[in-house]
Regions:
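Accessory "access/gating" subregions that flank catalytic or transport cores
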Residues: 5-140
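Hydrophobic alpha-helical bundle architecture
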Residues: 127-168
Length: 168
């Protein structure tokens, strides 16, 4: 409620775009094979991991490994110059999209609940940005990935509790 009160009227449209870009980014990364651009010739992993775990019998392993594939997919899209969401930065662009796709795969939540959870994740990212640093150049990669993990934790916690006060 707080977020909707203080944001612009078109904020929901903006968040829908964030959702779409994250979802599409993971999908593209899962579908693409080969090597990443550049001289290092780093092989893409997301498609292979996603395909291999489809035969996994343990449902917890299946979900865990699929989520890992989602994170790789978004990170590989970033590394190949694809369209991503900086959440909070390019260097950590796989964390929140992986959790978003995880939540969608669980099929336990309504779309509006996932959208509200994304807003809470953004709130956490803004708190860190205003009171600390999300910049790898300024505070090291732990600032980027730590913030992304905090945002993802808030996203998942909101889906579980629907209580922003408990999260913040």
């Amino acid at each position: 409620e707080y977020i909707n009160e203080v944001e612009e009227d078109d904020f929901d449209e903006y968040m829908e775009r964030i959702y779409d870009v994250m979802f599409d980014c993971v999908n593209r990364g899962l579908e693409t094979q080969g090597v990443l651009p550049g001289k290092l010739e780093v092989k893409r992993k997301a498609n292979r991991i996603f395909t291999e775990v489809s035969n996994d019998k343990d449902p917890y392993d299946l979900l865990r490994k699929r989520t890992m594939a989602f994170a790789y997919a978004a990170a590989e899209e970033n590394a190949s110059g694809g369209l991503i969401v900086t959440a909070p930065t390019c260097g950590a662009a796989g964390v929140l999209p992986a959790c978003l796709r995880y939540a969608i795969e669980l099929d336990l939540y309504e779309h509006h609940e996932i959208m509200d959870a994304l807003k809470v994740a953004g709130l956490i990212g803004n708190i860190v940005k205003e009171n600390g640093s999300i910049s790898g150049a300024e505070a090291g990669c732990q600032a980027e990935v730590g913030t992304a993990c905090s945002m993802a934790a808030a996203f998942l916690a909101y889906l579980d509790t629907k209580d922003v006060d408990e999260i913040v």
